Curated annotation (Swiss-Prot):
PROSITE patterns: SOLCAR. The gene is tpc1. InterPro entries: Mit_carrier, Mitochondrial_Carrier, Mitochondrial_sb/sol_carrier, Mt_carrier_dom_sf. This is Mitochondrial thiamine pyrophosphate carrier 1. Mitochondrial transporter that mediates uptake of thiamine pyrophosphate (ThPP) into mitochondria.
Amino acid sequence: MSAGGEHLKDEGTRRQVVLSGGIAGLVSRFCVAPLDVVKIRLQLQIHSLSDPASHRDVVGPIYKGTLSTMRAIIKQEGITGLWKGNIPAELMYVCYGALQFTAYRTTTQVLAQLDPHRLPPALESFVSGAVAGGLATASTYPLDLLRTRFAAQGTERIYTSLLASVQDIARNEGPAGFFRGCSAAVGQIVPYMGLFFATYESLRPVLSGLENMPFGSGDAAAGVIASVLAKTGVFPLDLVRKRLQVQGPTRTLYVHRNIPEYRGVFSTIAMIVRTQGVRGLYRGLTVSLIKAAPASAITMWTYERSLKLLHDFRVAE
């Protein structure tokens, strides 16, 4: 394996990078699926937790915190409720991981050919991460929307299967229905992935040489720190994306029946601030950060190990 911050940029064949990215996404998604469902439920909840009067006309559950939300889902929907939306999510994560790492590798190789006008390493990582994140997000967005809608279902099922959900959305909402909130997603993921990769590439060479690192290795620790910092900065757009994804004819049928009607990213932000305050933009942030740390650590660790395994296997042939 190569040293320093170049390890993600130039190692492995295209096939190895695609396969390693797909494996990393698959493993990561399955491990953090319960936290993802909890996060989505909290993000879609609009009533105040500190004002009991706002609970008077609420139809559906009232979630308070990560652990209590998890317990409520298990009690009302069974343990499998924590993996709702896992099929479209697994498909999304595999495709996303493969596209993301491939685009990142390709972009950095293109930027490396700009000599003698090559960008500084940190800026190069930022641009590559932004391009990779934007492309992967837009390409897999319909699966992201399906994941959210399945996770938002309570005991009453709106969609009975993945195929049925695709047919229903296509019939009742048209092609645009699969891209509700896509602008918020791209607006969120471009700076997120740019910041994530720039931080990760900067930290990994430093942390990889240290012993007794938390999370098991320098790769994982760098992934955790990079993810937490980037996630906090763009979280309001993530919440807006979730609220927009459940708009349409099924808006009042999810586990939270009182989801307002939102139109557009900026009007959604304004409405949330007006009715719920600035804190309303950060609902679910705690569980999001709890999820982001292991998810990114698992993703980067699995990617690095998968790539090394495939590389060693090829050399041994």
